[in-house]
């Protein structure tokens, strides 16, 4: 889940903290629980969580978002172990700066966005994230599980 919440840590209210963690972590938990019986019945499958780059880089005013997305990476690893006996792989794809409704091509560019372009010199396209998800869901990727895969144009190279 994409959560846009920028608040200095000292100003984050407990209700906002819990809301962000609920959107990200409860959302992944509930989706996985809903899908699990169907995946088990099918004899296996793939779960892909969508992480956040700030969980790996940090960012001002986003402690609650960073904590939630880092928790999602942990949940991915835990589920990979728990669900492996059911032939279910679980991975996390972490997009970089992507052309979305938040960064429409015709919208005026904010100076910090121009500075924050990745080494490839452009924002990614949603189709590039979809391609990674599609690849991870393919039959050639049954041995890949518990991984956090960054698709970010070189913005972070762990």
Where are these regions (language model features)?
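A conserved structural motif in NAD(P)-dependent oxidoreductases
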Residues: 118-129
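Substrate-binding pocket helix/loop in short-chain dehydrogenase/reductase
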Residues: 8-9, 16-18, 103, 114
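Active-site loop immediately N-terminal to the catalytic Tyr-X3-Lys motif
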Residues: 10, 57-63, 85-86, 121, ...
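Alpha-helical segment proximal to the catalytic Tyr-Lys
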Residues: 37, 81-85, 142
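Residue(s) in the substrate-gating loop at a strand-loop-helix junction
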Residues: 52
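Short, small/polar-rich loop/turn modules that mediate ligand/substrate recognition or access, typified
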Residues: 84, 89, 144-146, 152
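Catalytic Tyr-X3-Lys loop
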Residues: 3, 10-29, 48, 65, ...
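Active-site helix of classical SDR
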Residues: 32, 68, 76
